[in-house]
């Protein structure tokens, strides 16, 4: 399945504010460029794998919640919202982490642009992606790869 879309209008729509030209949305990579460097592609593929991790965790969580509610005979239409949990869990985690970091850093830096840049760079998911994006240059036996939820280890580094 095609996962990278070049010269994408979707990328232009979502990246016009940030200054970036490539974005990963719902497990697909969209870019304004005609081609991507291996470094940028590796960075975005780490985000793809993080999205897949969160999707699987969200699916498991939604199933557990659904069976628990059925066990107690609690059923209503709002349970259909649980279908959205796997799809949006990555963005919920990423956004929550970013907002907490941004608020903290806006008090620390007193300058919103610096707080924004600092909050973005100190995101655990971004830290893992930046850490692994150069691994493609190493010989195969020396490469580190993404492991499920390995980005949790970056919470102690922030």
Please provide the spans of the model-predicted regions.
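Short pre-active-site segment immediately N-terminal to the catalytic Zn-binding motif
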Residues: 16-42, 52
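Generic hydrophobic/packing signal
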Residues: 20-22, 46, 133
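Residue-identity detector for glutamine
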Residues: 34, 48-52, 75, 133
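Catalytic Zn2+-binding segment of zinc metalloproteases
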Residues: 45-61
């Amino acid at each position: 399945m095609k996962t990278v879309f070049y010269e994408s209008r979707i990328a232009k729509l979502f990246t016009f504010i940030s200054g970036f030209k490539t974005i990963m949305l719902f497990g697909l990579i969209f870019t304004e460029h005609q081609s991507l460097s291996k470094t940028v592609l590796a960075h975005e593929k780490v985000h793809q794998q993080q999205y897949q991790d969160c999707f699987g965790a969200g699916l498991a969580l939604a199933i557990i919640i659904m069976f628990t509610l059925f066990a107690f005979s609690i059923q209503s239409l709002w349970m259909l919202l649980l279908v959205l949990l796997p799809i949006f869990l990555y963005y919920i985690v990423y956004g929550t982490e970013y907002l907490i970091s941004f608020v903290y850093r806006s008090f620390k830096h007193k300058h919103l642009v610096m707080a924004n840049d600092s909050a973005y760079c100190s995101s655990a998911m971004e830290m893992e992606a930046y850490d692994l994006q150069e691994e493609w240059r190493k010989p195969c036996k020396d490469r580190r790869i993404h492991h499920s939820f390995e980005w949790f280890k970056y919470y102690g580094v922030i």
